[in-house]
Amino acid sequence: AFCRFNGQQCTSDGQCCNGRCINAFQGRICIG
């Protein structure tokens, strides 16, 4: 599965390259 970088939208399983997935105003995004 692909992973997302910080500031990008999380994948369906919430996988981030680093950091974690949070619920942001514009949807679920990865943060460090």
Swiss-Prot record:
Major localization class: secreted
The keyword Secreted is annotated on this UniProt entry:
yes
Keywords in alphabetical order, please.
Disulfide bond, Knottin, Secreted
Q: Which InterPro entries match?
A: Toxin_29 (IPR012634)
As annotated in Swiss-Prot or TrEMBL, what is the tissue specificity of this protein?
Expressed by the venom gland.
Cysteine-cysteine disulfides: 3-17, 10-21, 16-30
Coiled-coil portions? none
Family stated for the protein in its record: Belongs to the neurotoxin 17 (21C2) family.
Free-text comment about domains? The presence of a 'disulfide through disulfide knot' structurally defines this protein as a knottin.
Q: In its UniProt entry, what is this protein called?
A: U6-ctenitoxin-Pr1a
